[in-house]
């Protein structure tokens, strides 16, 4: 049986809106800005270097305060950007927003700290939420970030995962959308390249090989704007239950640069 959560496009649209609006800036409650790596909690942050980009790995975890036995739990494994506070704040904001994969559970919060307070007041004994953010790659001016959440609800058969990519342009201080990365008018060619990548992915999918017609009817190709620019091309991520059953996780399709010439803007292609 297929299950449907909030469409990926809804999350992507919010993220771009948040970027346009230029979002600024261990115990029972994480630091007010968990991803800002407060100096008062040095053990929770670890400086790291990704290419020429300075980052800090931020970790925090807690059960519900005062709870014994089966307790609600939150774990955060995020990333901060000491030289780009706007990006640090955006990562925090988007991770919190991504808990709205189930529209009925979207609460009045905008940061991880606010989400934590909401979660402690509403969670059932075995509920848990896991947050993870990391740099996927850096390509020239662009920093690609992978944001992931997974929610485990008491009584549910399995977790609800969600993954979102952000492509941050350092020179412009903003998120780059897919349409901004494509040459104007080349959206159709991008979709065709994505379909070819999907066809290659199906060739390696034992369920699809077993009964291609039935699989294609149940799990047809879909477009996606959820992309990350990497040194090998672009990677496109899909939600669970979108183009494959839950057992396949969140499928990922790769389009090499060789298939993106004449589609992706020249300044984003590898230079000879």
State what each model feature region is.
Residues 2-15:
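Bacterial N-terminal signal peptides that target proteins for export
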Residues 17-20:
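Feature marks proteins synthesized as precursors that undergo proteolytic processing into two chains
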Residues 22-25:
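C-terminal motif of bacterial Sec signal peptides marking the signal peptidase cleavage site
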Residues 27-272:
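Compositionally biased intrinsically disordered regions enriched in Thr/Gly
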